[in-house]
Amino acid sequence: MHIAIAGNIGSGKTTLTEMLAKHYGWEPKYEAVDYNPYLEDYYKDIPRWSFNMEVFFLKERFKDLLQLTRCSKQQTIVQDRTIYEGVYVFTKNNYKMGNMTERDFHTYMELFDSMTHILHYPDLMIYLKSGVSHLVKNIQSRARDYEQQMP
């Protein structure tokens, strides 16, 4: 079984993933936040690097989902970020805010649409909703360098 936790940055996805994995003995799958070669550049010049960064995240999340699809047949896996948030929240927001050209956005969406033919949706998706002040407090308290530069 594949259980996905969705929510904004700082909403508690990783914390809930840890709690569920520990309580039920499920296998946790965390978003790899340690390395993205575009992240630092992105926060310095968002319009220039948004497409590159979003494609990098899409590639990583797609690889994770392929692995999850194979593993979730034998065990329950709980995941703390989904490919769908990257597409329908972050990338779409970058486009709407003028940080991504229409051409780049359509190229990105065509790539994602091609991937969806072999993806399986999670068996259950849990959405965490939080107020902005709570999100900001959580982001600041964990002190990830790249998040401190967020506009």
Model-identified regions with their sequence ranges:
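Pre-Walker A (Motif I) flank of P-loop NTPase domains
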Residues: 1-2
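Hydrophobic anchor at the beta1->P-loop junction of P-loop NTPases
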Residues: 5
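P-loop (Walker A) phosphate-binding loop of NTP-binding proteins
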Residues: 8
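Conserved lysine of the Walker
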Residues: 13
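Post-Walker A alpha-helix
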Residues: 16-17
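Conserved substrate/cofactor phosphate-moiety recognition/catalytic segment
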Residues: 22-60
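A basic- and aromatic-enriched beta-loop-alpha substructure that forms the phosphate/nucleotide-
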Residues: 60-103
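A glycine- and Lys/Arg-enriched "phosphate-lid" helix/loop adjacent to the NTP-binding pocket
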Residues: 88-151
